[in-house]
Regions:
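Structural detector for helix-capping/boundary residues
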Residues: 5, 28, 42-43, 100-103
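A generic structural micro-feature
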Residues: 19-22, 67-73, 91-94
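Active-site-adjacent beta-strand/loop module that shapes the phosphate/pyrophosphate-binding cleft
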Residues: 61-86, 98, 103-104, 121
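The catalytic Nudix box helix
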Residues: 25-58
Length: 126
């Protein structure tokens, strides 16, 4: 999610099995029969309590997953517009959310280092 040159990130709860306590983008896992876009809308609603109205695909990150011997695929989107007010912490999956400039975002301890390249692309585009 982006607004006024800032990106919204969430700090993962310490009890999370993967990437506890680090900053992450808003997102989650596909459910059976769900499209990637439907997953995006559902996860944003669940995690920050707003409904995406306008979004665009950015790309994918493939991360090795030794637990299932198959890569974990992250589909990245930019949410440009939403309804439902200000994004707010709406899930126990995270302990806090915040808006960050490019310089701030790339300096954070992130779940995936590849996010930095996406932040640069999104925030440089305005």
């Amino acid at each position: 999610m982006v607004r006024d040159g800032l990106v919204l990130l969430a700090r993962r709860s310490g009890h999370r099995r993967r990437y506890p306590g680090v900053w992450d983008v808003i997102g989650g896992h596909l459910e059976a029969g769900e499209s990637i876009e439907e997953t995006l809308v559902r996860e944003v609603e669940e995690e920050v309590g707003v409904t995406p109205n306008r979004f665009s695909a950015l790309g994918e990150i493939d991360e090795p997953n030794p637990e299932i011997n198959d890569p974990h695929v992250y589909h990245l989107f930019t949410v440009h517009d939403w309804s439902g007010g200000e994004p707010r912490l709406a899930s126990d999956e995270h302990t806090e959310i915040g808006w960050f400039s490019l310089a701030e975002a790339v300096a954070l301890d992130l779940a995936l280092p590849e996010y930095r390249d996406y932040f640069r692309r999104v925030l440089a585009a305005g």
